[in-house]
Amino acid sequence: VSGSDWNKSAITEKLENMGADIVYGHGAVNEDGINKASLVVYTAAAKADNPEIVLAKEKGIRLIDRAEFLGAIMKNYKHAVGVSGTHGKTTTTSMLAHALIGANLDPTISVGGELDLIGGNIRTGKSDYFVTEACEYTNSFLKFYPTIALITNVEEDHLDFFSGIDEIIASFRQFAYLTKDIGYVVAMGGDKNVQKVLENADDLNIITYGMESKFDYYPENIVYHAGFPSFDVMKNGEKVCHIKLNVPGEHNILNSLATVAVCNLMGVDAETAAKGIETFKGTHRRFEKKGFLNGAVVIDDYAHH
């Protein structure tokens, strides 16, 4: 395995320690790696004039983008979850990792941030359970094969690619329809654009969650302790578990409701899912509290939006 990146990081150093040959710098070319490669996988951020892509084409080496590669892997799993949405993908994927690992399902996980539980952003399991973030940028998630498509919210983003919100909604609708006849869509019912995504989608199996009782999954008896919520999870009017979160904010109530809903569809009961969710204390660079400076709280949060 070989590759290149702009900068050295903990992830690339980990790969190097495992034997990967990596070169660094803008426009870096791992010529030796390309010469030996039978397949070149590139990120959506790498354009056609990237020197390694140009070299691979010249040598007739097969090229596929990361989404297509991940989709090809995903296709082999009986239970495959694609976690999509403008916000909340990494956090919800991480919550699912905690819940499914806690349920001893030995899942394969691909997450967009570093999660301490799995020692990075990838976990290779030996079961039929696969969970990955599903990003809409360049319509990447349309190359996936989800049996469960989770949509946390839909807003204007990646406007260097999409023309506007209507095109984004259309893309998410195509993603939802990847589950037609084979699985489920789990959707945040209170989001107006998610509602547009699923408008008249009567031929899909849709499970909703939100803050109101009109949705399939919703919270009751919410209490905050220093910003950290605890609440009862209700499913179609019945309490199925209680969750005491170790991450702050109402948005994480929604993320945990989505996690319980997906877990239920994968055969994990709500109580077991709740125990796993409660062990989740956040991922790196997702509203990560780093400490204090001159009396101010320092938060590290990675975001384009």
Predicted regions and their residues:
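Phosphate-binding loop of NTP-binding sites
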Residues: 24, 30-37, 44-189, 193-204, ...
